[in-house]
UniProtKB/Swiss-Prot annotation:
Entry protein name: Cytochrome c-type biogenesis protein CcmE
Parts of the chain that traverse the membrane: 8-28
Source species of the chain: Mesorhizobium japonicum (strain LMG 29417 / CECT 9101 / MAFF 303099)
UniProt-recorded Gene Ontology molecular function terms: heme binding; metal ion binding
Entry binding sites for heme: H122, Y126
Pfam families: CcmE
Lineage: Bacteria, Pseudomonadati, Pseudomonadota, Alphaproteobacteria, Hyphomicrobiales
Top-level taxon: Bacteria
């Protein structure tokens, strides 16, 4: 092999390695992606059982039910549609009815959303961006004007 051929084979091998590394990186990132949905968006979305998503909205009034141990069942709503959610773990201190929440998890085979994390808004003037945008688009939520 001539010197030029060796150099060309090293360059081609390096480019092939970089291409494979880039492809594997994008594949891994695609597997970890978690898309955000409001309850009404789920009627048109094709979410498979077991697919990780983020579900956001307001905790529906009168739906919080404490189960055995640290298991809690509640519904997340955008006032157009509600989704039943179960969560096992310690809820944030600010978790309560009619407050903004983002849950992350997947749907079980029974159609109930099984959350493995729950995020609640941190004060009365803050709403998670995804939830606020979704509720504003549906005309449900308006920002309060601070004085």
């Amino acid at each position: 092999m001539t010197r030029k051929q060796k150099r060309l084979s090293v360059i081609v091998g390096g480019l092939a390695f970089l291409g494979a590394a880039t492809g594997l990186t994008f594949y891994a990132l695609g597997q970890k992606a978690s898309y955000f949905y409001m309850p009404a968006d789920l009627t048109t979305a094709s979410v498979q059982p077991g697919q990780r998503i983020r579900l956001g909205g307001l905790v529906e009034k009168g739906t919080i039910q404490r189960g055995q141990g640290a298991t809690v069942a509640f519904s997340v709503t955008d006032t157009h549609k509600s989704v039943k959610v179960t969560y096992t773990g310690i809820l944030p201190d600010l978790f309560r009815e009619e407050q903004g929440v983002i849950t992350e998890g997947s749907f079980g085979p029974d159609g109930v959303f099984v959350a493995d994390s729950v995020l609640a808004k941190h004060d009365e003037r803050y709403m998670p961006k995804e939830v606020a945008d979704g509720l504003k688009a549906k005309g449900v939520w308006q920002e309060s004007k601070s004085e």
